[in-house]
Amino acid sequence: MNPFTLYWAGRMPVTAFLSSYALGLDRPDQWETWFYSLGGLDIARKAFAEQGLFYVGPVQHDLNIIHSKKPIRRFEDFKGVKIRVPGGMIAEIFAAAGASTVLLPGGEVYPALERGVIDAADFVGPAVNYNLGFHQVAKYIIMGPPETPSIHQPVDLMDITINMNRWRALPKSLQERFIAAVHEWSWVHYAGIQKANLEAWPKYRQAGVEVIRLSNEDVRKFRRLAIPIWFKWAKMDKYSREAFASQLEYMKGIGYVTDEELKGLSL
């Protein structure tokens, strides 16, 4: 299988920590470091093994952006906005900001925006969304400041998983080659998406779409909401706790969170 990992979160809470989440690790290289140098891959494989699956590896994809029918220029403007998000931790953070969150399958997002059933929608990145026609039904794209371009899902990871019995039946040499191929494909795929994004941005401008950048102060307001929700989700099962504890130490080490922000919170 090759899904977006976080869509398992209803069944496997740990998957909320196997892809990016609001104001956490926000660069592809950080996720690469966590998976391949800080134990993330082992955590993912243990968790998926309990579902009868072998987690081959993550696949880098893109950041997610928000398309909106109305201008959202500051944190407070999210209040009352009916927004489609993928659920889980992300939905809870937007709800805490006052938005009305909606779950919709991918195929229903465009028509929901077109008909005004929703005001805004998280979806994938610029190139994919342009090809799907989002510029036709939403004249605003909402992003964070340049250093935090996606406040809610900056590194939307996919994964490759295989039925465990099928995996075990493969020769060791073939398993090793397949793991290496997935790792290489991850970055080939990512690079292709980034090239397509560069080509998509001028098309949005030509279509009259305005890109709105939230401020650093808006990001700080979202962060204050997000951090307690991180801890809530981390307590949902043993793998969530293990994954987040590791990521939290990483974030502390690179200055993403401070002791003051974590005051009163524990795993």
Where are these regions (language model features)?
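N-terminal secretory/targeting leader peptides
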Residues: M1-W31, G39-L267
